[in-house]
Amino acid sequence: MIDVFPGVSSGGGAPSAQGDRFVHDRLPPRDQWPDLRYDRPELQIPDAANLVATLLDGAHARGWGDRPLLRSPARTLSYTQAAAEVNRIARVLTGELGLVPGNRVLLRGGNSVAMALAWLAVVKAGLVAVATMPLLRARELGDIIDKAQPTVALCDGKLLDELRTAQAEHPVLATIVPFNQDGVAGSLEARAAAQPADFTACPTAADDIALLAFTSGTTGKPKAVVHTHRDVLAACEAWPRHVLRATPDDIVMGSPPLAFTFGLGGMLVFPMWAGASVYYPDIAYTPEAMVRLIREVKATICYTAPTFYRQMAPFARAIGLPSLRACVSAGEGLPDATRQLWKDATGIEMT
């Protein structure tokens, strides 16, 4: 048994679609699982549920198809356009690369439209997303490969070197497909462009595995935290609904990477639940740059760490952030002094 911390529920009325039982078979004994309660009406997730089909494909039925979802300086994709791109990538994964539900796929990249599309395609296809922090080196990537045993990786073209070094020591990772490389033969974009824009979502059980989120390893080697489709959908029904009160008019910005569950929620799945949009810049954030981009993009919700809010405060005070209505902090302890400094600068009580 590998070091796995389950976030999975004990429900499970629908049959699993994941023929590859690698993760399922390595979960701890059921009596060691947490007791997760889904007793509120909005948490009555169907026993058969694919989170991407629910959030992305379901956007059309909710009238959000033409609304923007993924935004960057280079392009903006509506919910309908994003769904088509996700479908093409899912076809590459299952048709061209031969992956089957339950297989793990390593994802390596910073926050970008391409990274978001890749993650969504992996999960829609019933595969297990194993997203990794962009700063990880070959040795750290190797530890994750050892535990997750992915045969395929999707990697930002700017981050290939360390992953290729890890691959040389861990041949189970047979294939690396680069993305964010438009016009490059063999890239994910080139492969996807040759595929049709339709794909039937894998009929996953709600308790099938959606992702392995690796811890930072502060108490030893990183451990894999298991999240099911039900877990992610339940989080979407809780946080953006009750805390943020998110709406389709929200524009989300922030610094946490999609490989970090703080970033995955705040910078992708929570906006999707609300029909909102998320903006990924093409520059490295500095405190001043983030403040200026929030003002320029008219972002309404921001996610970052307490240290960054503290550093942003003087710039926010100087130029003002009239569009911003909610600020979420995580990743480290939030000192009361930082909370008060930010409130004095913006009038916003940090969450």
Regions found by a protein language model. Name each.
Residues 2-22, 124-191, 295-298:
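Structural core segment of the AMP-binding/adenylate-forming
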Residues 53-81:
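AMP-dependent adenylate-forming
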Residues 75-77, 92-139, 257:
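Conserved AMP-binding/adenylate-forming
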Residues 78-80, 203, 210-237:
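Conserved AMP-binding A3 loop
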Residues 120-125, 147, 260, 269-273:
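Short hydrophobic alpha-helices that are characteristic scaffold elements of the AMP-binding
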Residues 178, 195-214, 221, 245-251:
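Conserved pre-ATP/AMP-binding loop-to-beta segment of ANL
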Residues 233-251, 258-300, 315:
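Conserved AMP-binding/adenylation subdomain of ANL enzymes
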Residues 299-304, 313-351:
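Gly/Ser/Thr-rich phosphate-binding loop
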